[in-house]
Structures are given as C-alpha cells and as structure tokens.
C-alpha cells in the first residue's frame, strides 16, 4: 500500500519540527542519564517489536538481514538509530520529508497526480567490495556498448563475423542512417549511461537493462542524499559514506571534453523539452549545478551548419548540447516533421562536426532489449574479457526454435517489449491471469522481434516503511556512469528504486515505485558536505506535470523520462 503522503498534524506536545529532522536517541539518552537502564532497555525492545515485529523475510535475498534476527554488519548502525524511534514518530518524519520535497518541487507524476518524490528512510548499503564489483561491471558494460555503437555506425565487424545478426541492426527503429559514418569527438557516443541491476536469490548482482539514450533519475540521487544527510548526519560520518555531489562536475568535464576540436572554451547547454516534461526538475538542477544554460528548442537557431543560442546580448555559439529529448523529436528536418520542441538543423550541424550531441543520436540500437541478450558476447568480442556482471537468463523469440519454447512456458517467464520503458508492457507470467497470458502469447507470435523473455528473478528486498511498520519490499539499482573518452566513472551508489506495493516487482516511479538513498561505504573516512545549488537560473518552484506542449501526453515524455 502506498504510504499516505499527506502531512499529519504534529504529535501531542510537539510545537515544531524541522523539514529534515535528525534521527537521534533523545528519550533513551535522557533515561540513561537518570540511571533507569531497565526502562531504557524495555523501550528499545518495545520499539524494535513495533517496527520490525511483522518483518518476515521473503523468498529473496534481504539487504539488511542475513536471516531472521541477524543483521548484516553494514546495517548495524542504521538499525541502532531506528530502534528507539516510535513508529508514529518515524511516520511523522517521513511525511515531513515528503512535504519538504514538495516545497522544493521534487515531485513526479503518477496516475495523473503530482506527488512528492517518495524516499524511504531506510538506506540501501553497499560495502566497498560490493561496490568495486558493481563499478567494474558497469564500466565494462559501457565500454562494450561504446565499441558496439562505433562498429554499428562504422565497419560493422561484429555483424560480418556473426556475433550479432544483421536483422538486429536493420530492423531496429533506432538505427539512424544520418548517424552512419559520423565520428564523434573522442569517439564517445555514450556520455551518460544508466545500467539497471538486480540482486538475485543468491545475492549476486545481474544486469537487467541498459539505458544509453536519455537515462533519467540522477537528480533524485542528489536530492535523496541531501535529505538523508539531514536525517542521519552522525551516521554518515560513522559509516564513511562516499559522497555523490561530484556528479555535476564530472558530467560537465565530460561534456566539455566532447566539444569539437579547436574550441578553447566550449559552451555547453542542457536542451529540455520544457517545463511540461516530467523530468524538468532534473534538467534544471543539472544545468544549475554545472553552471550552464537550460534551453528549449526555440532558444537555439541553426545557421550555416552551426548552432547558436539566442540571448539578450545577441546570439552566442553553442558547441555541446546535452539533450534530454528523444531522437525523434530532436530535429524536424531529419526526424519527425511535426516536432515543435526540437531545433531544426541541429542534426546537420552535428553531422558537419560543428556541435556535439550528448548522448549521440542513434544510441537506441545499443539499449534495445534484444541487443541486451548479446552484450555478454559483445564484451568478449570487443574487450576480450569475461563479463563482470552476468545478464538475467533470457530468450529470443525471433530465433528459430526459441519462439515455441517461449510460448509453451509463457506462464513461467517475464515477457518484455524490446522498446518498452518505465515498466510499461511487462507481463510477469507467474502472476498474470489467463486472459493476459493469451493476449501476450498472440502478441509475441505476431511480432517475435518485438519481445524478449526472461526467467523471473526474485529481486532482493529491503526494509521499507509501510504505514507504521517495516516490511520487505523489492528493489533494484541504477548506477550512473559518465564517459569522458579516457575513463568511465561510475557515480558511487546510484538510484535504488523500490516497489512500494507488497509483492510487486515493478519498481519504476511511473508504476508507483519509490526510492532509497544508496550508501557506498568507503574503507576510510569520506568527506561529507551538502552541495548547494549554484549557477544561472532558478530551480522550478512548481513541479511540472507530465504533459506535452499542447497539453496532452506526448511520446517524448515517455522516451525521455521512463528510461
């Protein structure tokens, strides 16, 4: 059940409460000073029973508990901080945090309603060894996909050698001939990537999905950390949590490095579909943190295969465009002619080598879910390495012999549209009714290329506040990687998404999911500070609705946000 996001009245006796109250053992410490240790211990046991008494481990890996009553070492300080807090007080603090998010405009659209971004108070924690594995696996994956894109829009060696079938490229709606032969500066097409991971029943990380077009969600990583450092300030110092506030500087450095050659001081802009887009807050936040201009399509003009930005002081040249809209809407001269949110001629300027588009046009061929099934082979082919992170076991209905096997076992598999986003169109066979299974069977039979099938994975669970108790909820992890051409840097932590409804495996916010702050523990002390936003332009004060420029939902919002 989704938590009630209304802000309740303060508990009796409370006169005020800060937006991000520190979780502290106040009542317990007072009792200790009076010497009433027995009362304190009983209060601890009572609070522990109230919050975790109904916590039953599911048939999945639990992030906090190794087994009933046995806490994993990394979580011991967090559990100690939660124990003395009354459940009603914990709920009150969570609602106060939601109210603070609303005041800052950190919201999202769900079922046509604007809601505060749901952040759970229990963090997801990864120790240094776990994170080393994750970041090596994510960086390896990005390098392999980068090599694939260069090959697919160049010599096509992997296709000639039979590693990947030609039909995968030629039948892809994301293959753009305009991008063929275009050599981006530094050879980088994937400047930003979001690689979705899950932890299976054995506790091993597996890759669930690659996002290398317009990966979204990093602003929530930043905002989650800003909130949690105010809730658990002492824990951050005690736990040596690696900070996340270096992302904007890393991204800006990568974008500047991607500028066309011969530009001494490149001008970078963030191109947004506009305030009606569901992730407009993220676009504005990143532009502000990087100290660059946030622009819409009508703010740019192309002339002589160059891009200019209209300003009150006249037109200024633009060298790098970090674009947050889909290929189809980017340039009406090359793609959809009815697009009113793009910039006519910008693709021609990119093809002429006078502006860099980040991420590159045509990257969709690399995060096609059917291509996902070939990535382990691509890692071996291009990098001569074994995959650090395995895939989820997958099947390709478009291959001879696999279609009938998938159709026969459809009630035991997870069926996904290869071009789906935001959890849309996913059918979980073991939980689907007969009518849904039959409809899905016919859809797969009619278009085998449009689907993949996967073995169900019992996503790991994490204690999550449900009402006034903790309950196990399924989670995934989206680490964000930045590629500057010489190194692939992975933001420590990433976005942990949580399915707030009991038993649900769909974690996407567009499907009612929430989030957790992801703590990566350093081996030694990690400097902590909350970065204040700076740079040109205020953040939006009112959260935008997920509507298009004409007041209706448009495809670009799905493509830009649901990744």
PLM feature spans:
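Preference for protein termini
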Residues: 1, 8, 17, 27-29, ...
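Residue-identity detector for glycine
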Residues: 13, 35-38
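Compositionally biased, low-complexity intrinsically disordered regions
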Residues: 18-21, 34
